[in-house]
């Protein structure tokens, strides 16, 4: 019997690519969106979900279980970017980012766990970011939210092993998606001391997304993980230099690594 897969944020970008690929491989895939009515032509059904609202999470999972009786794989893919000098990002926007990138996935995990525990099996894949392994200038909130999800994945994984439930983390680098269009950019003050350096960083970020990897790569990695009996804790996916940056962080003294990042971002 084919497995049922729930992908949050499955209406565009990496989520859509994963959903279409896994559907073509014979899985019963359900994606989510805050506005499912916009995606009536989707290759797989799109359920209504706002990961920042507990009632929406509960209703989404209940709707899926009423249709399928099971959730075999949860892919926490929904996320949002945020940039800006930490001094000038409104606190409310920082909290909003964590609601989507960190607390939202936790809410989804906790909502599907009773069903997975009952069937004594399940796989949860958290999509984070290579940026979560390091604090990046003008991306500090995003790095922190993704890094927090990476760490809590490790804790959840150990707690859930006795129930036959696996959890893993996929940290992608830059992929060619529309993520830049939905990214929150903190509005700078007219006399902000960060005007020039922040602008340079934004240009670099947008260039990297435009030249990013094919999202189909992520879809194929997920397919392989689903067929792996004991997935690794962490998967880093992306260009060689992006993955190597994580290795360098472990090998280099902190101040040397910091200088490398500052040079890269022209600071």
Segments from the language model and where they lie:
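C-terminal beta-strand-loop-alpha-helix "lid" module of Rossmann-like NAD(P)-dependent dehydrogenases
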Residues: 161-209
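Rossmann-fold cofactor-recognition segment
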Residues: 43-55
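Residue(s) in the substrate-gating loop at a strand-loop-helix junction
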Residues: 129
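Active-site helix of classical SDR
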Residues: 109, 145-148
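N-terminal Rossmann NAD(P)H-binding glycine-rich loop of SDR-like oxidoreductase domains
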Residues: 11, 15, 19
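A short, exposed helix-loop element centered on a Lys and neighboring polar residues
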Residues: 109-110, 154
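Substrate-binding pocket helix/loop in short-chain dehydrogenase/reductase
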Residues: 85-86, 90-95
């Amino acid at each position: 019997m084919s497995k049922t897969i729930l992908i949050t944020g499955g209406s565009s970008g990496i989520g859509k690519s994963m959903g279409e690929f896994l559907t073509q491989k014979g899985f019963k895939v359900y994606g989510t969106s805050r506005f499912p009515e916009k995606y009536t032509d989707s290759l797989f059904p799109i359920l209504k979900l706002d990961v920042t609202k507990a009632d929406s999470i509960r209703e989404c999972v209940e709707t899926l279980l009423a249709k399928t009786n099971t959730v075999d794989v949860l892919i926490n893919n929904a996320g949002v970017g945020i940039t800006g000098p930490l001094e000038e990002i409104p606190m409310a926007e920082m909290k909003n980012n964590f609601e989507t990138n960190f607390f939202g996935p936790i809410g989804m995990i906790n909502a599907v766990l009773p069903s997975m525990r009952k069937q004594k099996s399940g796989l949860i894949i958290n999509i984070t970011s290579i940026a979560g392994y390091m604090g990046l200038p003008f991306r500090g909130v995003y790095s922190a939210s993704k890094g927090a999800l990476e760490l809590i994945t490790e804790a959840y994984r150990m707690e859930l092993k006795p129930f036959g439930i696996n959890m893993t983390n996929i940290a992608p680098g830059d992929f060619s998606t529309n993520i830049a269009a939905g990214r929150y950019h903190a509005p700078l003050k007219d006399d902000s001391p960060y005007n020039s350096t922040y602008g340079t960083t934004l240009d670099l970020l947008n260039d990297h997304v435009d030249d990013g990897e094919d999202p189909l790569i992520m879809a194929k990695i997920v397919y392989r993980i689903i067929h792996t009996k004991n997935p690794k804790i962490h998967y880093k996916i992306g260009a060689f230099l992006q993955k190597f940056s994580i290795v360098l962080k472990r090998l280099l003294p902190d101040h040397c690594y910091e200088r490398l990042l500052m040079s890269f971002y022209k600071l």
